């Protein structure tokens, strides 16, 4: 397996809290690990259910579902704890990657130098345990490395989420992202407008991220919504995405500027569920990535709250929609962590 799932530690915690039945929640990339963990726990006399819905991140814990099916605890794989109220004790397992970050950096040192001498280093939960080692290596190569602390939605300095890039709001000429895919580095580039180099520790490949093409597409969405009179404003019931006050603000703003607007409550936000409504455009006040990454599947224009402000002439510069928190009191431990009901 490519990721660390500390089965014995998880079992120890479950025994400590007296859990007899658990629900395991995992993203699609960790389904095999979830099944393997289930087998191990059942061998140790713990009843296990697997959560089959798509998981979008730490913002979407299945604690409510765990409680409904009589589970004593939830095991959440692949993400770290986000400060949210929980209905059952929940074990967060970051699933650290078993791959060397430094080896990938060594392979791409020439590209990293193009960022400049003062760089900001970021990563995801899967590689966060190697961030200190990465920083030391880069400093030995002559770089001045900044790692931002981030806010209360972040577990560790340097960690990015798809909706939160607070760790990158520090001084630096460019940003180095350590991780796979362009999901996070694209968000970094749009949120900070800095040069972003992504290095994949699994393949050792690099990618330079250009946000301008992406931003042009967003301006096109705003233009398409310019003549819309009826707006559906979507709010999510996922705990870490629930922004009801912001959604109500957007409804009020649209009405103030002569548009019709109605609030729509959803769990998973996608256009197919909205086909029968007569709205001419939508505003997603839930996961900020839905209108940005999935807009091609929408037959109507779909905007973020900040894009609505541009539409109404209240904002000129394009700004990435983030879900930000307050100051973080302490970091999470490196490894599993358990958080109880509140």
Curated annotation (Swiss-Prot):
One of the GO biological process terms: S-adenosylmethionine catabolic process
Pfam families attached to this UniProt entry: Diphthamide_syn
Disulfide bonds: none
Keywords for the protein's UniProt record, in alphabetical order: 4Fe-4S, Iron, Iron-sulfur, Metal-binding, S-adenosyl-L-methionine, Transferase
Superkingdom, natural source: Archaea
Entry binding sites for [4Fe-4S] cluster: 59, 163, 287
Other observations noted: Unlike the enzymes in the radical SAM superfamily, Dph2 does not form the canonical 5'-deoxyadenosyl radical. Instead, it breaks the C(gamma)-S bond of SAM and generates a 3-amino-3-carboxypropyl radical intermediate. Thus, the P.horikoshii Dph2 represents a previously unknown, SAM-dependent, [4Fe-4S]-containing enzyme that catalyzes unprecedented chemistry. Moreover, the chemistry requires only one [4Fe-4S] cluster to be present in the Dph2 dimer, although each monomer can bind a [4Fe-4S] cluster. In contrast to eukaryotes that require four gene products (DPH1, DPH2, DPH3 and DPH4) to catalyze the first step of diphthamide biosynthesis, no other protein than Dph2 is required in P.horikoshii.
Record text on subunit structure and interactions: Homodimer.
Matching PANTHER family: 2-(3-AMINO-3-CARBOXYPROPYL)HISTIDINE SYNTHASE SUBUNIT 1, DIPHTHAMIDE BIOSYNTHESIS PROTEIN
Name of the protein in its database record: 2-(3-amino-3-carboxypropyl)histidine synthase
């Amino acid at each position: 397996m490519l990721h660390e799932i500390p089965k014995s530690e998880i079992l120890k915690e479950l025994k400590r809290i007296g859990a007899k039945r658990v629900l395991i929640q995992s993203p699609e990339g960790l389904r095999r690990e979830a099944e393997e963990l289930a087998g191990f726990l059942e061998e140790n006399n713990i009843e296990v259910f697997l959560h089959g819905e798509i998981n979008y991140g730490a913002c979407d814990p299945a604690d409510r579902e765990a409680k409904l099916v009589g589970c004593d605890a939830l095991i959440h794989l692949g993400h770290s704890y986000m400060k949210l109220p929980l209905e059952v004790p929940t074990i967060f397992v970051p699933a650290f990657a078993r791959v060397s970050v430094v080896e990938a950096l060594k392979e791409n040192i020439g590209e990293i130098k193009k960022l400049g001498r003062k760089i900001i280093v970021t990563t995801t939960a899967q590689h966060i345990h190697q961030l200190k080692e990465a920083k030391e290596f880069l400093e030995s190569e002559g770089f001045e490395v900044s790692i931002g602390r981030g806010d209360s939605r972040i577990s560790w300095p340097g960690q990015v989420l798809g909706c939160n890039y607070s760790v990158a709001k520090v001084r630096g000429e460019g940003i180095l992202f350590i991780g796979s895919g362009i999901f996070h580095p694209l968000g970094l580039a749009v949120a900070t407008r800095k040069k972003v180099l992504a290095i994949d520790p699994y393949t050792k490949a690099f990618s330079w991220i250009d946000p301008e093409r992406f931003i042009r597409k967003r301006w096109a969405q705003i233009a398409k919504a310019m003549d819309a009179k009826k707006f559906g404003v979507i709010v999510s019931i996922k705990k870490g995405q629930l922004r009801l006050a912001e959604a109500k603000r957007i409804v009020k703003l649209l009405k103030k500027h002569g548009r019709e607007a109605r609030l729509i409550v959803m769990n998973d936000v996608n256009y197919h569920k909205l086909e029968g409504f007569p709205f001419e455009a939508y505003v997603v006040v839930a996961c900020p990535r839905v209108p940005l990454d999935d807009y091609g599947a929408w037959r109507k224009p779909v905007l973020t709250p900040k894009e609505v402000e541009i539409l109404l002439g209240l904002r000129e510069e394009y700004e990435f929609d983030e879900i930000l928190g307050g100051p973080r009191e302490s970091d999470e431990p490196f490894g599993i962590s358990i958080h109880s009901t509140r």
